[in-house]
């Protein structure tokens, strides 16, 4: 991966908890030497807690729709070091997000479906307090 790009791994376990998922994923990532290129995210605060307990240096983010819900989970003690809201659900003023890493996502199309065709206005997102974005089509921004 390029130095300024990270790969987000979303742990899809907020409805059904998969025993040992976090351990297996960390083992796989470390076996390939990719630990510095990965961000782990989940809607499950417990899953983020487990990742952080297993690897205190792991980059993690708590997912939710609204940024206020992400912040609520973070302050609940999940140990995430970033907020991962939907980019269209920035319901707090940017000054409330000062000091936080805010990696926003969208529900855009996934490869190999037809490309979305547009580009996000990254400057406008930054003005809302977003520091990073998850993209299904990162090649459009290179």
Question: Can you name each region flagged by the protein language model?
Answer:
Residues 3-142:
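Short loop-to-alpha-helix "cap/lid" segments that border enzyme active sites
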């Amino acid at each position: 991966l390029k130095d300024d790009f990270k790969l987000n791994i979303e742990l899809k376990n907020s409805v059904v908890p998969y025993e040992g998922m976090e351990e297996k994923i960390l083992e796989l990532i470390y076996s390939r030497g990719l630990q510095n290129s990965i961000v782990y995210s989940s809607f499950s605060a417990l899953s983020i807690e487990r990742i952080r307990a297993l690897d205190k240096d792991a980059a993690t983010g708590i997912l939710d729709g609204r940024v206020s819900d992400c912040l609520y989970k973070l302050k609940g003690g999940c140990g995430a070091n970033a907020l991962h809201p939907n980019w269209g659900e920035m319901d707090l003023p940017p000054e409330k997000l000062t000091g936080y890493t805010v990696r926003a996502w969208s529900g855009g199309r996934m490869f190999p479906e037809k490309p979305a065709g547009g580009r996000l206005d990254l400057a406008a997102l930054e003005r809302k307090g977003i520091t990073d974005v998850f993209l299904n089509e990162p090649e459009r921004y290179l």
